Regions:
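Bacterial N-terminal signal peptides
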Residues: 10-18
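Bacterial N-terminal signal peptides that target proteins for export
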Residues: 1-10
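Sequence/structural signature of beta-propeller domains
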Residues: 21-355
Length: 355
């Protein structure tokens, strides 16, 4: 159970586990600070509140836009600046949105309604097995269905985009569904297969990073609809955009692989302390963020983000982690996050800074 402390900043910290001496030294010399920005209610202290922000899950932003938050608990998307200021737009996203991405193309991922058609600027996956798109020229207040895989029982927990494709992590069917620019289902030569992932684990989080697709795997519950959080459960893989396995980045069965229903993924930029350039992996299960550095064809555990007194950051119900765009969504060296604290009954939007 997390212990929350809310001084001028909001930080939940837990100290457990064993790390290597080298990792410990890096962590001690590299403190981070958590800042609460917006929550759904006063029970989760933050400078601002927004009742729609319940179980905030996915985060996306364009090159200059504010953050778009996928609020799984209210089936909405709300917008925030990097400073935590709410933008006066709330979009309805049916089915409990999870992952979200920005689309910069004026011709890809077209949605239609009442004789109008237009490219979706922001896209969402939901737990009902659909991909929806928001187009301001078609319907300014509601995201519209572009692809529907509910008929095969799909449960989409995440969404990524690369080139003119969408990648949705289908947790129920333990696969990655890929859609072309017209929302048509695509079969790729690689198929996003890793024979070393045991049965009972399924694609959970998914992000396009550094030209490749990174996928986290979590343990399925009996119905194969929700994750089973527990220390030491999970994997992270790297694939090409064609679904060919590049590397198994993290195997929780090995030493120094502290996964616990990991979902969030981000590449740290220059200026993010000693973990600059590393792959950051955020756990939903215990709220911790671990760093991995690429070393040739392998990835090496470097440690976890910690506050000044050495205890690891632990954000209750942690989902998305993503860096700002240098414009409306905040500095490129600031790591933003969404979470669903209190058993996903609340929501928090915040940031993490180095130093």
């Amino acid at each position: 159970m997390s212990l929350f402390r809310w001084p001028a900043v909001a930080c939940a910290v837990i100290l457990v586990g064993v790390v290597t001496a080298a990792a410990w030294a890096r962590e001690q010399a590299n403190p981070y600070t958590v800042h609460a920005l917006v929550s759904d209610a006063s029970s989760v202290p933050a400078p601002a509140t927004d009742a729609n922000l319940i179980n905030g899950w996915g985060l996306s932003a364009g090159p200059t836009t504010p953050w778009w938050a996928a609020n799984n608990g209210t089936s909405t998307s709300t917008l925030y600046s990097g400073a935590g200021t709410k933008v006066a737009l709330t979009v309805a996203v049916a089915g409990g949105p999870t992952g979200t991405v920005f689309n910069g193309s004026a011709t890809d991922f077209v949605v239609s309604q009442n004789g109008k058609s237009g490219a979706a600027r922001f896209l969402f996956a939901n737990e009902a097995g659909m991909v929806l798109g928001w187009s301001p020229t078609v319907n300014g207040s509601t995201a519209l269905v572009g692809a529907d895989r509910s008929g095969v029982g799909a449960v989409y927990k995440g969404l990524a985009t690369a080139n003119d494709r969408l990648y949705a992590s289908d947790f129920h069917n333990a696969r990655v569904d890929v859609f072309d620019a017209s929302f048509g289902l695509v079969t790729l030569p690689g198929g996003f297969q890793d024979p070393k992932i045991p049965k009972g684990f399924a694609p959970f989080g998914i992000q396009a990073l550094g030209g490749n697709i990174f996928v986290t795997y979590a343990k399925q519950d009996a119905a194969a609809k929700d994750d089973v959080p527990a220390p030491g459960l999970g994997y992270v893989d790297e694939f090409t955009p064609d679904g060919k396995l590049v590397a198994q980045v993290v195997n929780s069965q090995k030493k120094n692989a502290p996964l616990n229903a990991a979902w969030g993924l981000a590449l740290a930029p220059t200026g993010f302390g000693n973990f600059a350039g590393d792959l950051l992996v955020g756990n939903f299960g215990d709220g911790r963020v671990s760093a991995y550095a690429q070393s040739g064809a392998k990835w090496v555990y470097k440690g976890q983000l910690r506050v000044g007194d050495g205890t690891p950051i632990a954000i209750d119900g942690l989902w998305a982690i993503a860096f700002g765009n240098g414009a409306a969504s905040g500095p490129v060296t600031t790591l933003y996050f969404l979470s669903g604290p209190g058993g996903e009954k609340n929501g928090l939007f915040g940031s993490i800074t180095a130093g």
